């Protein structure tokens, strides 16, 4: 029996146990990837803290890059040896949402993977040596190998470092969905990004890539604001020192922004985002909140000022990942500059502990071969 190493979340908490699992086998329409890198994301952190319900034991990690190691029957879009990346939303391609082009809310992904830790035949691909199943969060990228549906495997262009490409599958992918598909940013728009962590920084650079004239980055961390400026923010606001709503109003001559992106998932930042948009503007909620978190809403203000409040959860893998890869290959979005820390599999929990303390600038990645 062939095995691999994986960082397993045995129970709620910020510690992984690196153990041997059976080498996963791809079934029909599936691809096995030898993982080069996996991004360290707040969404996984919510699972670790118990703020998002997910079966345990499980393997987390939902943005990966690597080399195709094996393919199942019927796979034609990639070949063994290809350098590939996968997005965190793995579309089934068959449910009522997927057939309408709404792969970002694929029913099977939520029903099987996010709730049960399985792929779409109702089974995980991860098993302990004794045959005990282990849940998969997306493709379970915190491991040496990962099995992914072929609907979610995309060839990485030559010239893009494979380890850096991992973050395209969530933090950049999520930003593309919010900016392009939900907000529909147009040339000349003014934008605020509330919270510039891994996703927020990409909202900054993607908004600029799609023509936003002013991009106001808002955070409490000076180093994150400085990186946001380097990635294209025209203005930065430290909300620990300044009222962010008043600052945005001042920057926009009292009007407010056309679009405010909220990338933290906290009640106060959501309320601030709503308060800083112009009449007829849009608030796009991107940050994942712990279960049960609610925010206050001034209904009369929203109605009278025709403010749109929109949710955005990722993007459409088969439609949008090719665009993500093109923008990265052309240098219109930067990925290497966003990765500040790299860890081996044995130190994956250290990466998440630092993320929990707010110490990661941009994005950290875990490289299982490191």
Predicted feature locations:
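Cysteine-cluster motifs in flexible loop/terminal segments that predominantly coordinate metals
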Residues: 88-145, 149-151
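Short Gly/Pro-enriched turn/cap motifs at secondary-structure boundaries
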Residues: 22-23, 55-61, 79, 134-138, ...
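Residues located in well-ordered beta-strands
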Residues: 5-7, 17, 22, 34, ...
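Mid-domain Rossmann-like dinucleotide-binding core that forms the NAD(H)/NADP(H) cofactor-binding site
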Residues: 80-83, 144-145, 151-153, 157-242, ...
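C-terminal hydrophobic helical "lid"/dimerization subdomain
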Residues: 1-2, 271-275, 318-370
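Glycine-rich cofactor phosphate-binding loops and adjacent beta1-alpha1 units
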Residues: 183-187, 210, 220-222, 226-308, ...
């Amino acid at each position: 029996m062939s095995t691999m190493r994986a960082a397993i979340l045995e129970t709620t908490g910020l510690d992984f146990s690196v153990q041997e699992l059976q080498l996963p086998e791809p079934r029909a329409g599936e691809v096995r990837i030898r993982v080069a890198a996996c991004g360290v994301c707040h969404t996984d952190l919510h699972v670790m803290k118990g703020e998002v319900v997910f079966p345990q034991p499980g393997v987390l990690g939902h943005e990966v890059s690597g080399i195709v190691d094996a393919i199942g029957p019927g796979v034609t879009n990639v070949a063994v040896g290809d350098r590939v990346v996968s997005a965190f939303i793995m579309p089934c391609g068959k449910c009522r949402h997927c057939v309408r082009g709404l792969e970002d809310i694929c029913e099977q992904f939520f029903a099987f993977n996010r709730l049960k830790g399985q792929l779409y035949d109702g089974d995980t691909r991860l098993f302990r040596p004794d045959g005990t199943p282990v849940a998969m969060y997306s493709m379970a990228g915190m491991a040496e190998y990962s099995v992914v549906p072929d609907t979610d495997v995309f060839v990485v262009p030559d010239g893009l470092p494979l380890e850096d490409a991992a973050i395209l599958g969530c933090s950049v992918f999520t930003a593309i969905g919010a900016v392009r598909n939900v907000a529909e940013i147009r040339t000349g728009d003014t934008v605020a990004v509330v919270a510039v962590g891994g996703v927020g920084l990409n909202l900054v650079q993607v908004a600029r890539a799609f023509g936003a004239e002013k991009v106001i980055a808002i955070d409490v961390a000076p180093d994150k604001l400085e990186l946001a400026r380097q990635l294209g923010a025209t203005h930065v606001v430290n909300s620990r020192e300044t009222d962010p709503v008043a600052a945005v109003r001042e920057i926009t001559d009292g009007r407010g922004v056309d679009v405010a992106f909220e990338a933290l998932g906290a009640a106060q930042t959501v309320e601030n985002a709503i308060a800083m948009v112009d009449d007829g503007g849009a608030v796009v909620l991107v940050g994942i909140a712990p279960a049960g978190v609610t925010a206050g809403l001034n209904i009369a203000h929203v109605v009278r000022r025709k403010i749109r409040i929109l949710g955005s959860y990722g993007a459409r893998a088969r439609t949008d990942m090719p665009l993500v890869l093109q923008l990265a290959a052309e240098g219109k979005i930067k990925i290497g500059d966003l990765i500040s820390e790299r860890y081996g599999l044995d130190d994956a929990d250290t990466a998440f502990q630092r993320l929990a303390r707010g110490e990661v600038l941009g994005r950290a990645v875990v490289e299982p071969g490191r």
